[in-house]
A protein has these predicted regions:
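Residues that define the transmembrane beta-barrel architecture of outer-membrane proteins
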Residues: 29-31, 50-56, 89-95, 111, ...
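Extracellular loop and loop/strand-boundary signature of outer-membrane beta-barrel proteins
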Residues: 43-46, 81-88, 135-141, 172-177
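Bacterial N-terminal signal peptides that target proteins for export
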Residues: 1-8
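Predominantly the C-terminal beta-signal and adjacent terminal strand-loop region
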Residues: 77-80, 154-195
Length: 195
């Protein structure tokens, strides 16, 4: 009888406490792999189709104290420039390393807001290295190494204990290329917590 009472009390405690257990989030040293994608230099519309671009990124986050984080990764950006009846692609392959400071979060760490800065370096190619166009015109801007940085604003919300939805906006400023220094990006992403 005594054994049955202990088992019933144990089962009741498990049922009562099961909804109150939460995973620990943003612990120092915790890492996450994130995939991001989005638009570059404006919103997509039919009349701006030839001027816009897109980006994809893969990076690793490492959390520090206070839910801030270090971010290291790579990104691919492609932007188009209209020319007569075609569009010329400008592609950038960049690596980045930066720090994102958590300035707002709720008590359970489900919703977090970050502001961050990153150093960036990479390579830019104009029309995939083809300088001569179909009509005989020549592109004067060639392929080049680019360097600079980015300022980012990011929002994270946990979907599960190991899956995070990201919303981001950033302004990139890169020198060395001949097609413009500033590019605004916005997009979404998913992060998968590894540790």
């Amino acid at each position: 009888m005594k054994r049955t009472v202990f088992i019933l009390i144990g089962m009741a405690l498990c049922l009562v406490l099961a909804g109150k257990v939460q995973a620990q989030r943003c612990l120092p040293g915790m890492k996450g792999l994130r995939l991001t994608a989005g638009m570059t230099d404006g919103f997509h519309s039919a009349n701006r189709r030839n001027e816009l671009g897109y980006h994809f990124g893969l990076s690793m986050d490492s959390y520090t104290k206070g839910c801030s984080k270090w971010v290291f990764g790579a990104e691919y950006l492609q932007k188009y420039h209209p020319y007569k009846d075609m569009r010329l692609p400008v592609s950038q392959f960049t690596a980045e390393g930066g720090y994102y400071y958590n300035f707002l979060s709720d008590a359970n760490k489900v919703f977090l807001c970050y502001v961050g800065g990153s150093a960036m370096a990479g390579y830019e190619t104009v029309n995939w290295g083809e300088s001569l166009l179909y009509d005989g015109a020549r592109i004067t801007d060639g392929d080049a190494f680019v360097y600079g940085g980015a300022v980012s604003l990011e929002i994270e919300t946990y979907l599960t204990n190991r899956t995070v939805l990201l919303l981001h906006a950033r302004e990139r400023c890169l020198w060395g290329g001949g097609t413009g220094n500033f590019h605004f990006q916005f997009g979404v992403g998913l992060k998968f917590i590894l540790d």
